[in-house]
C-alpha cells in the first residue's frame, strides 16, 4: 500500500467493556499490556492507515491514549460493532477524508499483520462494497458447529469469493471445501454509511448474522481466503492462550 492509499484508510477498533463472558475484557492483562493495546499494536504492525480505538468507558480511553494510540469515546448503548465504528468514524473523520474503513475486532490480540492487509485486496475491484476474510475448514467438528459461521460464495479466483450467503448451518451441501468466516471487515465509507442506515433484515435476525443485512440489501461482499483463523478472546481460557502466544513471540 502506498502512502496516498494509507492516508485514505482508517482502522477502527471497537472496544466494549460490558462483555458477558469476560467482563472488562479490553483491559485484561496480556504480557503486561491491556488487551486493547495489544490489538492496536497488531493493527499498527499492518501499516495500512490511521488507527482509532472506539471505546465506551473512560478507563479504556485512558489505557489506549496512555499507550500512545488515538481513542474516541462512543455511546454505551450501541446494538452492534458496526454502529459503534460508524459513530467513531463521524467523530474521528468529520470531513470525510477516509475512503476505506477497516473494522478490526477489539478481542484479536494475536492477529498477524497479513490478514489485516488481506482485507483490503477485494476492494481493488470498484464493484465491491465490503471485504472480509475466510479460512478453509480442516476440523470436521467446525463443519457442524453453529458458532462457526460459514461463507457460501461464488469463486472469483483461488483466493477470493463473492459472498452469496453466510450461515451457521453446514453449507453448501455436497462434496468440496467449507469456509470459516472471519469477522474482520473493510468497508468503503459509503457502504458503511449505507449499511448502518438499514434496518435489521429478516435473515440477519434469523441467523443472528449482521452481514446478511448487506447482502439482502443488494450490497456486494467479496471474501479473501487467508491461512488461519485469528484467536478471538471470549473466555478466560482464550485469554490464557493469547498470553502464551504473545509470550512466545517476545
From Swiss-Prot:
<dbReference type="GO" id="GO:0033468">
    <property type="term" value="P:CMP-keto-3-deoxy-D-manno-octulosonic acid biosynthetic process"/>
</dbReference>
<comment type="pathway">
    <text>Nucleotide-sugar biosynthesis; CMP-3-deoxy-D-manno-octulosonate biosynthesis; CMP-3-deoxy-D-manno-octulosonate from 3-deoxy-D-manno-octulosonate and CTP: step 1/1.</text>
</comment>
<dbReference type="InterPro" id="IPR003329">
    <property type="entry name" value="Cytidylyl_trans"/>
</dbReference>
<dbReference type="InterPro" id="IPR029044">
    <property type="entry name" value="Nucleotide-diphossugar_trans"/>
</dbReference>
<keyword id="KW-0963">Cytoplasm</keyword>
<comment type="function">
    <text>Activates KDO (a required 8-carbon sugar) for incorporation into bacterial lipopolysaccharide in Gram-negative bacteria.</text>
</comment>
<comment type="pathway">
    <text>Bacterial outer membrane biogenesis; lipopolysaccharide biosynthesis.</text>
</comment>
<dbReference type="GO" id="GO:0005829">
    <property type="term" value="C:cytosol"/>
</dbReference>
<comment type="similarity">
    <text>Belongs to the KdsB family.</text>
</comment>
<dbReference type="InterPro" id="IPR004528">
    <property type="entry name" value="KdsB"/>
</dbReference>
<dbReference type="Pfam" id="PF02348">
    <property type="entry name" value="CTP_transf_3"/>
</dbReference>
<keyword id="KW-0808">Transferase</keyword>
<protein>
    <recommendedName>
        <fullName>3-deoxy-manno-octulosonate cytidylyltransferase</fullName>
        <ecNumber>2.7.7.38</ecNumber>
    </recommendedName>
</protein>
<keyword id="KW-0548">Nucleotidyltransferase</keyword>
<keyword id="KW-0448">Lipopolysaccharide biosynthesis</keyword>
<dbReference type="GO" id="GO:0009103">
    <property type="term" value="P:lipopolysaccharide biosynthetic process"/>
</dbReference>
<dbReference type="GO" id="GO:0008690">
    <property type="term" value="F:3-deoxy-manno-octulosonate cytidylyltransferase activity"/>
</dbReference>
Amino acid at each position: 500500500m502506498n502512502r496516498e492509499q494509507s492516508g485514505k484508510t482508517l482502522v477502527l477498533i471497537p472496544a466494549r467493556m460490558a462483555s458477558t463472558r469476560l467482563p472488562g475484557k479490553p483491559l485484561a492483562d496480556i504480557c503486561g499490556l491491556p488487551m486493547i493495546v495489544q490489538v492496536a499494536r497488531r493493527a499498527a504492525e499492518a501499516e495500512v492507515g490511521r488507527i482509532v480505538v472506539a471505546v465506551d468507558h473512560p478507563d479504556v480511553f485512558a489505557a489506549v491514549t496512555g499507550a500512545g494510540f488515538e481513542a474516541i469515546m462512543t455511546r454505551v448503548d450501541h446494538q452492534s460493532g458496526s454502529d459503534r465504528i460508524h459513530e467513531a468514524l463521524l467523530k474521528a473523520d468529520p470531513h470525510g477524508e477516509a475512503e476505506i474503513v477497516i473494522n478490526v475486532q477489539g478481542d484479536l490480540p494475536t492477529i498477524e499483520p497479513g490478514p489485516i492487509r488481506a482485507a483490503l485486496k477485494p476492494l481493488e475491484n470498484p464493484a465491491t462494497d465490503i471485504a472480509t476474510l475466510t479460512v478453509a475448514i480442516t476440523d470436521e467438528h467446525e463443519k457442524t458447529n453453529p458458532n462457526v459461521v460459514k461463507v457460501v460464495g461464488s469463486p472469483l479466483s483461488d483466493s477470493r469469493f463473492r459472498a452469496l450467503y453466510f450461515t451457521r448451518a453446514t453449507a453448501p451441501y455436497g462434496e468440496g471445501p467449507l469456509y470459516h468466516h472471519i469477522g474482520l471487515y473493510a468497508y468503503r465509507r459509503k457502504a458503511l454509511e449505507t449499511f448502518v442506515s438499514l434496518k435489521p433484515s429478516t435473515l440477519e435476525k434469523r441467523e443472528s448474522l449482521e452481514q446478511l443485512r448487506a447482502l439482502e440489501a443488494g450490497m456486494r461482499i467479496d471474501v479473501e481466503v487467508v491461512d488461519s483463523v485469528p484467536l478471538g478472546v471470549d473466555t478466560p481460557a482464550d485469554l490464557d492462550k493469547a498470553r502464551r502466544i504473545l509470550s512466545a513471540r517476545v
